[in-house]
């Protein structure tokens, strides 16, 4: 899904003169820092749509020809710097007309409201007037009012770009069914001690490994029908955690995408250049996890357990938990474990996944790590 930045024109992209009409080339002047800020937002995956009220455009006092020359030059300058607008929406009514297409009305937005490819949660509106903020409120998106002497406001373009493009990757997922109530909170850009409470102490200990060794803040609270058995609690926790990972990663721009064993790993055979899963030992046990946030869920598990359960966690639910994460997050995971002690083997699986996640979620720029254009 694609986020859209709706932008006002006069006073937002270009400065607004005293007569409120940019009807001559000499009146055309860009707002400070607008181009580098929009380039940053473009690289973060945003598309741009101009939404502007132009009082009485086409009337004798404001001929369309006087408007189009400076407007076309503005668009050409933006295009020369790599900034293209998906659409330019102009309302030509007068304030007294109370037209539904005039901001803060959203009459011009009908085609966009019907477009299911838009990421409305990340979309926003930037303008210099309170009507722009009201327009954002009517669309149920975030609004940023640029700081001006005439209308106030608190934001400048660099701050808006930072807020939208560098926003922390957070998610809160609440999954409620007749069998369980699961709440997962995570922040992929903050390190904190994990907090877990599922009613299953050994499972809690394993979940803590994901946050601790994954290098991100993780909090999980679960209430399930443990009087029946552990299945629903463990399965639904995996589904909620997978959904939280998917939501926090967003469009996945800039992430490593893959988690695997680096060539410098001490566990590699000398001269081995092939890509392997992220491998780690735990006493006699060795586990390997290779993953890809491809958007196509797939899980392969290679390992066996001798015991029916470790602590309060049935060993048959270990691969099932990982499969649930994959299904909900769109993750491709290959997980292998060898050893003698089942406690070590289960814990090594969780730690291997966590270390592979740490590598895959790391930001390495702004590019989308695929040739398809979407993940």
From Swiss-Prot:
It is found in: Cytoplasm. GO terms for biological process: L-histidine biosynthetic process. Its main location: cytoplasm. It holds the Pfam family IGPD. The active site is at residues 8, 10. Residues 1-168 are annotated as: Histidinol-phosphatase. It catalyses: D-erythro-1-(imidazol-4-yl)glycerol 3-phosphate = 3-(imidazol-4-yl)-2-oxopropyl phosphate + H2O; L-histidinol phosphate + H2O = L-histidinol + phosphate. Its EC number is 3.1.3.15, 4.2.1.19. GO terms for molecular function: histidinol-phosphatase activity; imidazoleglycerol-phosphate dehydratase activity; metal ion binding. This is Histidine biosynthesis bifunctional protein HisB. It comes from Xanthomonas euvesicatoria pv. vesicatoria (strain 85-10) (Xanthomonas campestris pv. vesicatoria). The lineage of its organism: Bacteria, Pseudomonadati, Pseudomonadota, Gammaproteobacteria, Lysobacterales. The gene is hisB.
């Amino acid at each position: 899904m694609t986020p859209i930045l709706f932008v006002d024109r006069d006073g937002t992209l270009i400065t607004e003169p005293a007569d409120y009409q940019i009807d001559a080339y000499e009146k055309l002047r860009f707002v400070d820092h607008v181009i580098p800020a929009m380039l940053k937002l473009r690289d973060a995956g945003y598309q741009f749509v101009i939404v502007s009220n132009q009082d009485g455009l086409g009337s004798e006092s404001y001929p369309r020809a006087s408007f189009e020359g400076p407007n076309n030059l503005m668009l050409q300058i933006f295009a020369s710097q790599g900034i293209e607008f998906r659409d330019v929406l102009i309302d030509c009514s007068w304030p007294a007309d109370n037209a539904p297409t005039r901001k803060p009305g959203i009459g011009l937005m009908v085609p966009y409201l019907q477009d299911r490819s838009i990421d409305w949660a990340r979309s926003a509106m930037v303008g210099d007037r309170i009507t722009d903020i009201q327009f954002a409120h009517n669309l149920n998106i975030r609004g940023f009012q640029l700081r001006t002497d005439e209308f106030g406001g608190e934001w400048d373009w660099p701050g808006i770009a930072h807020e939208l493009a560098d926003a922390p990757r957070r998610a809160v997922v609440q999954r409620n069914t007749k069998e369980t109530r699961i709440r997962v909170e995570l922040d992929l850009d903050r390190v904190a001690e994990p907090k877990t409470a599922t009613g299953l102490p050994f499972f809690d200990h394993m979940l803590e490994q994901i946050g601790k060794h994954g290098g991100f803040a993780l909090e999980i609270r679960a209430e399930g029908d443990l009087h029946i058995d552990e299945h629903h609690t463990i399965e639904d926790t995996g589904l909620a955690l997978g959904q939280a990972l998917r939501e926090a990663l967003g469009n996945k721009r800039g992430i490593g995408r893959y988690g695997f064993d680096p060539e410098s790993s001490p566990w590699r055979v000398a001269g081995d250049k092939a890509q392997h899963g992220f491998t780690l030992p735990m006493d006699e046990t060795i586990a390997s996890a290779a993953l890809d946030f491809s958007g196509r869920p797939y899980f392969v598990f290679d390992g066996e357990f001798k015991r029916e359960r470790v602590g309060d966690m049935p060993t048959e639910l270990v691969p099932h938990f990982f499969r649930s994460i994959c299904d909900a997050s769109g993750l491709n995971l290959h997980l292998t474990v060898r050893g003698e002690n089942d406690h070590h083997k289960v814990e090594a699986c969780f730690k291997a996944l966590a270390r592979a996640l740490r590598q895959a979620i790391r930001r390495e720029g702004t590019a989308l790590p695929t040739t398809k254009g979407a993940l």
